[in-house]
């Protein structure tokens, strides 16, 4: 099997993991996977967006995976984008990760410049979940999902490198030639 029946999966969003999520759904539909005891913690969420906003990462996960498998949505965690107190939002999310026993498998995509989650290259390894000001390049890259660049949130909550590296296993997925240099430099 791919993972224990009660595994804690760290999940990512963006275009890179969509193919993997489609494959997981296919295996679920064939009866090869059961998500009923799975817990998930997502890598990040835009600050200021509610989970029902169609640009939120909660919405993305519902649309691309959770709505298609038998996962208990009360055990699917995404940082609270509506929490205005950044310190509280981050502390709460770190506590969730600890309370579920840590992450068994962390799925990551890698950005063209080498970012994982919203952690830019060179981010401190000791950081846990934190609020980041999105870089201009990240805002531009994500603008394709919004009506205009002005609508792209300027901040996000993201797991830190410390959270990610604490996972028992990490699965880094990259697709397309635009990611080749970033992948090469990360190894």
Q: Which residues does each predicted region cover?
A:
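Short, small-residue-biased leader/transition segments that mark boundaries at the very start
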Residues: 1-2
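Glycine-rich N-terminal segment of FAD-binding domains in flavoprotein oxidoreductases
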Residues: 5-29
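Glycine-rich beta-strand-to-loop/alpha-helix junction loops that act as flexible
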Residues: 11-16, 108-112, 175
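A glycine- and small-aliphatic-rich helix-loop capping segment at beta-alpha/alpha-beta transitions
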Residues: 23-34, 57-59, 121-131
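Ligand-binding beta-strand-loop-alpha-helix segment within the catalytic cores
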Residues: 33-105
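Glycine-rich phosphate-binding loop
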Residues: 101-127
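Class I SAM-dependent methyltransferase SAM-binding "motif I" and its flanking Rossmann-like core
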Residues: 117-161
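ATP/nucleoside-binding phosphotransfer catalytic cores, i.e., glycine-rich phosphate-binding loops
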Residues: 162, 166-187
